[in-house]
Structure formats: C-alpha cells, structure tokens
Amino acid sequence: MSFFEYKDIIEEGDLVLAFLGRSNIKPITVTKGSQLNTRYGNFEHDRMIGMKYGEQMPGAKGVGFIHLLYPTPELWTVSLPHRTQIVYTPDSSYIIQRLNVTSGTRVIEAGTGSGSFSHSFARTIGVEGRLFTYEFHEPRYIEAKKELEDHGLLANTVITHRDVCNDGFEISNIPEDFKKDDGICGDVVFLDLPSPWTAIPNLKSVISHQSRVGICCFSPCIEQVEKTVKALETEGWSNIEMVEVAGKRWEARKDMVKDVKDVVKRLKDIQSRKNQGIEHRKQSKIHNVGDKRDIKEVETADDSSPEPTKFQNLGKGFNPFGKGLRVREGDEQFQWRNVTKIESEIKSHTSYLTFAYMNPNVRLNTSVE
C-alpha cells in the first residue's frame, strides 16, 4: 500500500477508507474474515476484496451502504487516529504552497505527532525529495513510524526519536541516499512544537547553505508567536510574517424561483377561499336555526364526541410553490436557481502560522563570525 501510487482493485491487506458521511470516515485494513460494523449496517471484508476503489458497497443484509475510498493525505487527515492535535488541510495546503514545497524538496519537520502533515509532505516531495521528521514522545514515535512504513512512505522519509529543543537536529546515521553534502541540508523547516524558539538556534547546521530556506512555526497562542519572532530575528531570519487561515466551506443549493405575480394570485386565491368559508358557515347557521334537541342528547353528544381530526395541508387551491407538500429540491415541476451559502458551523481558530526566510549570505556571515 503506497500513498505515492494509485490502484483500482482492492486486495487483502490494503488500506481502505470507509466513507460513511462527510464527517465520518473510518480507516480499515482489509482482512479476510473481518467485518466492519456500523449503524448503517455490517460490511464484510471478504466482499471488499476484488471491488474497485470508489465503489459503493451495500450492507451484508442489503441494509445501508458505504463508499470504499483510496487513501490520500487529505482523506487520511480527517480519518486518522488522533494522538495529538493535527494540522488540517486548510493550513497544510497553505504552508506547502507558501514555502514552495515541490518534488525534490528536502523538508525538516519537528513534531511528527499523529503524522497528518508528514503524509502531506511525503506525498508532495515525491520519491526524489526527502523528509526528516522528529518526535520526542517515544510511544507516538513508534506508532507514527509503523504508520509511515505501512503506507509506503519510508522510501523518502526518516523519522527520528529526538528532543530537538535540547539535542538539536543532527542525525549521525543518515542513510547514504538521504544525504546531501554529507548532511541533512534542508530547504524547508516546519516546527510544530510547544516552544519553537528553543529549537530555532539549532537549525543552522542542518539547513541548506546554497539556497534560500523557508520556515513555518505552528503556534496556537499569540504569546508563543511573540517569543518565536524574537528568536527568528536573533538568528538572522528575515521577512517574518504571521498569518491565520480561516477555512469556510461554501455549500451549493437550489432555491425555488417565485414570481411576484404568482404570489399575488395565490394571496387572492387564499382570500377568496376564506370568504367562501365564511359565507358557507353563515348559510349553515341560517339552515340550523329552529333545530331543537333534548338536553340529554346534547350532553351525550358532548361526552362521546371524538377529538377533532388534524388534516394535513394538501396545498389546495392555486399553489404554484408546493406549499404544504413535500417538494424535493430540484423537482422539475418547479423553477429553480443555483445559490450558495456558508456552512452553518464555521470552524474557529486552529493556530497561528509564522513564516520567515534565511538567505545564504546571512548564514555564511554568521558562520564566519
């Protein structure tokens, strides 16, 4: 299973993302004899083998269905098991674009965490690029390393168990095909740490000396940003800027087109039927005058009278908009127009992104001093 390639047919041992809904995606490894149990039904792994990625799979008893999706970094981000707070696609895509991460880029990442951004970096830099990622928490390091191995990403990724704030970024046993100028020689740096300002002074020995290097620090609090900016200035980084990405989803809908003439005509029709009803009641009272019943009959009728029946509004009279009826969006009997609106629940602040750049001449001058 590899995030670098795509395949059509699902085989045993493959990673499949079971799409139950926009906010409910379950990652499963296809294993013979296993079964995925959901509120939408039961789905046997044996039946998944041989199916195509993207295909809709019905439940075991014909109840419910799921879609079997091929894993991508973006889908993995919204379905992975959380070990830490993660970097979501609105932030990660902006960081990759702004730092100009492309095929062949050498990336240094501190704070592997749940591995969300590691997957995006590894996919973007391709087989020619190199990712050096660090995690200080050993259990998280072990789990992240296994995930990267299972997903075929260790071909361009080295994960290291290290506290980079105290011990730096140097790696003594770098594989030969990962070396450049006998070292890491990073082009881009991403720090997702509680105190990135303590790790910034350790970067100069592992970043490129031949090209401009970009850095992004991911910090939830503005106090962290202040300390990070001071450390960047002290170490000679320039073009420092802090941004915040606010992602909003625009939802497409169809809105029924209502003509003013039809509205006026419907109001007149309602008033006309109302007047007819009033007149009908008046006539009924006139015809019932003189009818006399025994008091006992009246009392008996009152006691045994059933509860009034509630009738559904069936849209009687002139009804050009289907009022009182179940009208499906896009129904061809009515006229529609395409509209958009912002999602009802907008995600709030995630983190501040602090960007800066180091030019080769600044780095060389600092080294000479």
UniProtKB/Swiss-Prot annotation:
Keywords attached to this entry: Methyltransferase, Nucleus, S-adenosyl-L-methionine, Transferase, tRNA processing
Subunit comment: Heterotetramer; composed of two copies of TRM6 and two copies of TRM61.
GO MF terms, alphabetically ordered: tRNA (adenine(58)-N1)-methyltransferase activity
A Gene Ontology biological process term: tRNA methylation
Protein family per UniProt: Belongs to the class I-like SAM-binding methyltransferase superfamily. TRM61 family.
Residues annotated to bind S-adenosyl-L-methionine: 114-116, 135, 140, 163-164, 192
PANTHER family per record: TRNA (ADENINE(58)-N(1))-METHYLTRANSFERASE, TRNA (ADENINE(58)-N(1))-METHYLTRANSFERASE CATALYTIC SUBUNIT TRMT61A
Subcellular location per the Swiss-Prot or TrEMBL entry: Nucleus
Taxon lineage: Eukaryota, Fungi, Dikarya, Ascomycota, Saccharomycotina
Source organism of this protein record: Debaryomyces hansenii (strain ATCC 36239 / CBS 767 / BCRC 21394 / JCM 1990 / NBRC 0083 / IGC 2968)
Keyword rRNA-binding set for record: no
Function description: Catalytic subunit of tRNA (adenine-N(1)-)-methyltransferase, which catalyzes the formation of N(1)-methyladenine at position 58 (m1A58) in initiator methionyl-tRNA.
InterPro entries in alphabetical order: SAM-dependent_MTases_sf, TRM61_C, tRNA_MeTrfase_Gcd14
Name this protein carries in UniProt: tRNA (adenine(58)-N(1))-methyltransferase catalytic subunit TRM61
Domain of life: Eukaryota
